Amino acid sequence: LKSETGEDGRIRFWGHDAEGAEMAADRMRSLHLSNDETDRVKRVIGNHMRIHSMTNRFLDERKQPSRRAIYRFFRDTREAGVDLVLLSLADLRATYEHTLPESLWKAELDVCRILLENLWEHPAEVVKPPSFLNGHEVMQAFELSPSPLVGALLEAIREAQAMGDVSDKDEALVFASNWLKKEN
């Protein structure tokens, strides 16, 4: 791993999240743990810096995590999202021990609160919006053949729903038409 010492004296290991996730997955496979267990641990380790990044943006730019960021966080972490919230808090405490700035701790708590509020209070709006269209409807409406493009379009529609830009089937069709024009 490549390391770097910052101006603040802290040592950073670039890429440790991805490399650590692969190392853990290899170890879990050698122990014959299930694919589900391996996938969950891999997601936790591979994504453990994301909340810290959201917190840094919150501190630096005074921007709370966007609906898009929240949607993508839970899309990518799946059932491990809550695990990551707890891990990020423990990781921050362990990193700073007794020198943790109160402003950083409060910001990390705020980001974690925002993530959990959206997961538990607004799941259908932000975290996992219901599908207004399925692949067959998209292929029929736009005369498409089965392809990765159909899946990418469905994902783009869901993300637009999570952002509040699409709120029904008609809006999903308009969004899809515009998206396809941009892609072609």
Model regions: which residues?
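C-terminal subdomains that position terminal phosphate/3'-OH groups for nucleotidyl transfer/ligation
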Residues: 1-184
